[in-house]
Amino acid sequence: RSIRRGYQKSGFLWLKTLRENGFGGILADDMGLGKTLQVISLLLSEQESAKAGEWEWHRSLIVCPASLVYNWQKEISRFAPQIKTTLVTGLATERQRIVRHTKEGEVLITSYDLLKRDVELYRDMVFAIQVIDEAQYIKNPGTQAAKGVKQITAGFKLALTGTPIENRLSELWSIF
C-alpha cells in the first residue's frame, strides 16, 4: 500500500469498516490530505479480498468533475496499476459502447455532466463501490447531476469533499 501517514491509514480502515458493515460514508477533509489515496487503497483492498474468495467483486464507479477524470485515472495507475480503469468519455455512442463492454472488476470513471446524460446506461448495472468526488457539486438535490448519482445501484457509496456544508444542512443531506 502507498498509505504513508497515520491519519490516512485510519481513514482507510474507517472506510473498510463502513463497507463491511453496509454503511455509506462521507470523507471530508482539507485538500491535499489524501482522500484519493485512501479510496484507491480501498479499491485495491476490495479487489484483493475478491481474489481471495471473500466476496464477489463487481465494477466500481467514480463520478467527479470533468477536470478530475484524467487525474483519477493517473492516480490509480500510479498507486494501484493492477486496477483496470476505464474512462467513460467521448461522444454518446462511444460512451454507450464503453459502458456496455465493461468487465467485472473494472473501475469506471466519468464526470457528473456525462453521468446525468448517460444515467440510463447505468440503470441495470450493480457497482461494488460508487465514489463521488467533490461531492459539494451536487449540494442541490433537485439538479440532474444529484438525481443521476442517486439512481446508481452500489453496495457502498462514498462521497469525498473538502467542503461538506457551505451554507445549509440540506447540502449534506443531498449528497446521499
Each language-model region and where it sits:
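ASCE P-loop NTPase motor core, strongest for the SF2 helicase catalytic module
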Residues: R1-F176
